[in-house]
């Protein structure tokens, strides 16, 4: 089991490596597999994010799915494929940020636009392990080559390394 996310219906979603997606109903205390009810890109799931609009973002080893939990058959839509997704973070503007093996991607839920940032844009590495917002229009990003602060307003990265005081870059 790699991650959990609780939805508004008191279901605890469970990400597994190789066994797909499950949920545990906190009211009935029953487990349910939804492998046969969705079209997940991949059953190797590393991270989950539950959004207030009742969507579950499922980060897999081959991209990300967005599952509409209001749909009776849990309809799944592919957002980004062919990337290992390590982390998911949603900011206050409704942008879902994805940390992957191929950089940092921001998916705007309203416009459906996907923007990807890589080392060519200033990241120290394209392997993004974690993303966290700080409430000041910045994202903090951990990579396998240091930490970055991403300034969303001007799309700039400030990178921090061992030389700046980190214990290690990874």
Positions of PLM-derived features:
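Carboxylate-rich, polar loop motifs that coordinate divalent cations or form catalytic acidic clusters
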Residues: 1-170
């Amino acid at each position: 089991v790699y991650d959990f996310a609780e939805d508004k219906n008191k279901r605890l979603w469970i990400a597994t490596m190789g066994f797909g997606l499950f949920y545990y109903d906190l009211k009935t205390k029953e487990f349910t597999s939804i492998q046969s009810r969705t079209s997940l890109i991949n059953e190797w799931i590393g991270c989950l994010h539950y959004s207030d609009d009742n969507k579950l973002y499922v980060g897999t080893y081959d991209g990300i799915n967005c599952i509409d939990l209001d749909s009776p058959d849990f309809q799944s839509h592919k957002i980004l494929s062919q990337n290992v997704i390590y982390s998911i973070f949603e900011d206050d503007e409704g942008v879902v940020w994805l940390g992957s093996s191929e950089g940092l991607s921001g998916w705007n839920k309203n416009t459906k636009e996907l923007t990807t940032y890589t080392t060519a844009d200033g990241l120290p590495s394209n392997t993004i392990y974690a993303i966290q917002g700080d409430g000041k229009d910045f994202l903090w990003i951990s990579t396998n080559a240091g930490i970055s602060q991403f300034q969303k307003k001007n799309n700039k990265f400030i990178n921090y390394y061992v030389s700046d005081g980190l214990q290690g870059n990874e």
